[in-house]
Amino acid sequence: TDRFPGIFHGSLWEVGKCSSSSFEIYIPPVEYYTTGTLILDGSMGYIGIVDRPIEIKIENGYITYIEDTEDGRKLKEYLESFDDLEMYCAAEFGIGLNTISKCRGASYIEDESAFGTFHIGFGRNLALGGSHNARGHFDLVTHNPTIIVDDKVIMKDGHAKAIQPIEWGVL
């Protein structure tokens, strides 16, 4: 495909430029192909922290099922508020790289940056190198995930196979 991973590193290299404070590696998936089950146990973007894990099913790139729990209903209500079915489309896969950040539900940027987390974004991904347009973008963060892509383990219990944490102050 023509999809390439990107990295948000929170660093500014040029005067007058702006950067996200996020520290993550991400890739926009090919639209309409993502299929699987997400057990959401971290945070729901602007909604906040998840009180108990929610099962979410994705088929052919779109959310098809959200477990009927209090948090599940909040998520459904939030997505429905966009009045845009394209907000249900998988748009980003990301892995947090910041060993200082924590997933607390107070700031979605910090949540998705926390080392050992995985997030899946839904909706628009044009700025990430994808081709999907929607009325917004929304990330769901999960703790200590196991990620399997094409029968290859990318991350096991929050430990990425190719990414190791940097101990700050050692550099």
Residue ranges of model-derived segments:
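Short, glycine-/Ser/Thr-/acidic-enriched flexible segments
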Residues: 43-45, 62-63, 70-71, 98-101, ...
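Structured core elements
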Residues: 37-39, 55-57, 65, 94, ...
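Long, Lys/Arg- and hydrophobic-enriched amphipathic alpha-helices
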Residues: 126-171
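Cysteine/selenocysteine-centered motifs that mediate thiol-based redox chemistry or coordinate metal-sulfur cofactors
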Residues: 86-144
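Short, solvent-exposed amphipathic alpha-helical segments in soluble enzyme
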Residues: 54-57, 73, 80-84, 109-111, ...
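Active-site and channel-lining beta-strand-loop segments
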Residues: 52-66, 146-147
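C-terminal, non-catalytic macromolecule-binding modules
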Residues: 62-96, 102
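Active-site bordering "gate/hinge" segments
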Residues: 1-52, 59, 74, 84, ...
